[in-house]
């Protein structure tokens, strides 16, 4: 597990500025942009992204779809739809884990060596950040333990408080 954890990076900043093979967009089911990171990615990528997204016919919660990066430094955008928090008894944890797994599978299938994730579902979808970060780090580390690609996974955090949650989640996994 420690080798997988060595491939994880924590970054505080703007995901739209990262020069990686793919960034992950915390999208809605329509894939047509919205608030938070979704809106920021759509604005930074340009109108061409919306045109391509319209052709994808949406995305189910827990699934992922891939587009070009257009005006972003990233070659690709992987769009995944996280669950809306409903108290934790409606399969939210499994759906959130599926977002990370599906995104990593698409990244590997498209030869992405580096992938950056936002904190999926923790904004307007109200998923508790401490739980979400544990699921994110746990799922990603399990997937990359078994696969060579992507080589590097970045958790791109909007603020230092969120970055600290990711650092603690990684440290907890290192301890076992």
From Swiss-Prot:
<dbReference type="GO" id="GO:0061463">
    <property type="term" value="F:O-acetyl-ADP-ribose deacetylase activity"/>
</dbReference>
<feature type="domain" description="Macro">
    <location>
        <begin position="1"/>
        <end position="174"/>
    </location>
</feature>
<dbReference type="InterPro" id="IPR002589">
    <property type="entry name" value="Macro_dom"/>
</dbReference>
<protein>
    <recommendedName>
        <fullName>Macro domain-containing protein mll7730</fullName>
    </recommendedName>
</protein>
<dbReference type="Pfam" id="PF01661">
    <property type="entry name" value="Macro"/>
</dbReference>
<dbReference type="InterPro" id="IPR043472">
    <property type="entry name" value="Macro_dom-like"/>
</dbReference>
<comment type="similarity">
    <text>Belongs to the MacroD-type family.</text>
</comment>
């Amino acid at each position: 597990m420690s080798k997988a954890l060595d491939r994880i990076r924590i970054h505080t900043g703007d995901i739209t500025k990262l020069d990686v093979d793919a960034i992950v967009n915390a999208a809605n089911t329509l894939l047509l942009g919205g608030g938070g990171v979704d809106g920021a990615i759509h604005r930074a990528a340009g109108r061409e992204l919306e045109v391509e997204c319209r052709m994808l016919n949406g995305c189910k919660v827990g699934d992922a779809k891939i587009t070009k990066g257009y005006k972003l430094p990233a070659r690709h955008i992987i769009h995944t739809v996280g669950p809306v928090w409903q108290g934790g008894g409606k399969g939210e944890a499994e759906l959130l884990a599926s977002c990370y797994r599906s995104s990593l599978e698409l990244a590997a299938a498209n030869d992405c060596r580096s992938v950056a994730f936002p904190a999926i579902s923790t904004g307007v979808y109200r998923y508790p950040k401490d739980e979400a970060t544990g699921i994110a780090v746990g799922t990603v580390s399990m997937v990359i333990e078994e696969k060579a690609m992507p080589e590097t996974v970045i958790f791109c955090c909007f603020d230092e408080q969120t970055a600290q949650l990711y650092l603690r989640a990684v440290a907890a996994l290192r301890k076992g």
